[in-house]
Structure formats: structure tokens, C-alpha cells
Amino acid sequence: MAELHWTRQWRGWEGVAAVRWATAAARAADPPALALRGRHPADTAASPPPPRTAGARARTSGADGRRRGRPLGPAQRGRYLLRDTRQTLGREPKSFLCRLCCQEDPELDSDKDETGAYLIDRDPTYFGPILNYLRHGKLIITKELGEEGVLEEAEFYNIASLVRLVKERIRDNENRTSQGPVKHVYRVLQCQEEELTQMVSTMSDGWKFEQLISIGSSYNYGNQDQAEFLCVVSRELNNSTNGIVIEPSEKPRFFRKRALECERTV
């Protein structure tokens, strides 16, 4: 089992946190986990650490010798325990966490405490997006966090794919801000009733459905009339040159064939 302990020691009025991360790896038959324990900002550096309770310690079952951990109780103010598997930490083979917790790279000469745990001085606030990306491969950044902070942590942990994603998001946000108010391109597509489902399902490249208008039909196929519709779709005007929309070549032919020459930019 791999444990990562956070103890915050706040210095100065501005609330700068010195975060001590301690990782201790124990070999066991069960897939190891990552445990995070933090101190509440109100705790001072002079206050001694509380004794570890039975619920905070990893236990060993008698049958298979597996070690188990349990979240800390709510009575222990400001302290929490987060567990994760070694498989998640090793998702990026060249990352810092994989080399430290999974490969036990001897080149990572990190300081250790009296228990042999590694000490890493980083801010745990931005560790959530890092861990979530290792879990499911998606970049999730809440409104309280900034992309620059996540980028800094991604570079520190040497997660190259995450670094690229964060840089792309920062670049998109900058482009959106520099372009001013968002403009939209509207397109009207004419289709028959039997083609409506296919047309909607083939929309791509950021096009969104806006409105469906029934216009009737003057065509007669045998004994059954085919109703006709106008489908209004739109998308943000991102890739443009002098107001002319540049459409990707891979857009479905059906989508282009049904487009009418009545698009306008608002």
C-alpha cells in the first residue's frame, strides 16, 4: 500500500502553505493505494500532530494478509484520507508519481522523514485535476482553480499528455477573449421527413440544432406525400478568414448537399 500524507503548515498573514507530502510504500497482495491526509488551515505549525487512531492505520486481515484503510472520522477536524490504486498512479510511465510510487526510481533522491516517507513541498489544492486525469483521462478544472496552476503541477509531475491538454485549453480561452463577442453562423437545411433523422445524426464540427420548421411539400411519391422541413443549425465562428467560414474537408457530404445558400453571420 502506498500512502501520501499531507500536513499543512501556514506561514505569514498571506496564508502561504508549506505542504509536507509523505509517501510510504508497503508491499501487500492487494493493489496498493494512495492515501492523502491534510491539515486544516486553522491548525498552526506549533500544534503537535494528533496521534494516529485505529481507523487511520492500515489493517491486515487474518485470512489473506491484505492491508485495508478507512477514511478518518468527521470528529478529526480538517483531516481527510484519499485512497487510490498503484495502477492509477502508474498510468503515465514517465511521470513523477509512477517513478516514485510504482518504479521506486533510485534517481529520485527526495528527502525522507523518520518513518522513511518521502517529503514533497507542493500545494495539494491542484492535485485533484492531476489525479482525476490519471483516473479517467479527462481534464476537469473547477471554477475555483486556474489553468496556470494546473499546468504548473502537470509539468512538475511530468505528465506530458496533460500538459498538452492544459496548454490547448489556455490557448482556446485566450483566443476566445481576444476575438471579443462570440459570433455565430446560421445555416438552413432543407430535408424530407425520411431524411430528417439522418441529417441530424450527421451534424458535426460544432454545429448545433436550433429550430425545425415544417414547410409542407409539393411533391407526391405514389399515394403518400413526403413532408418537408427546414432545419436551422448554428455554430460559433471560430475558424474564419475575413468573415468567411472555413469548413473542414471531412464534413459529411450529405450535410453540405442539403445546405441552402442562406447563411448569415450575426
From Swiss-Prot:
GO MF annotations in UniProt: protein-containing complex binding
Database matches in SUPFAM superfamilies: POZ domain
Record's keyword terms, sorted: Acetylation
One Pfam family, short name: BTB_2
Residue ranges with Low complexity bias: 53-63
GO biological process entries: protein homooligomerization
Designated name of the protein: BTB/POZ domain-containing protein KCTD2
Region of interest called Disordered, as start-end residue ranges on this chain: 38-79
Name of the gene: Kctd2
Keyword Acetylation: yes
InterPro entries registered for this protein in UniProt: BTB/POZ_dom, SKP1/BTB/POZ_sf, T1-type_BTB
Modified residues (N-acetylalanine): 2
Keyword Acetylation: yes
SMART domains: BTB (SM00225)
The BTB domain, residue ranges: 76-174
Cystine connections: none
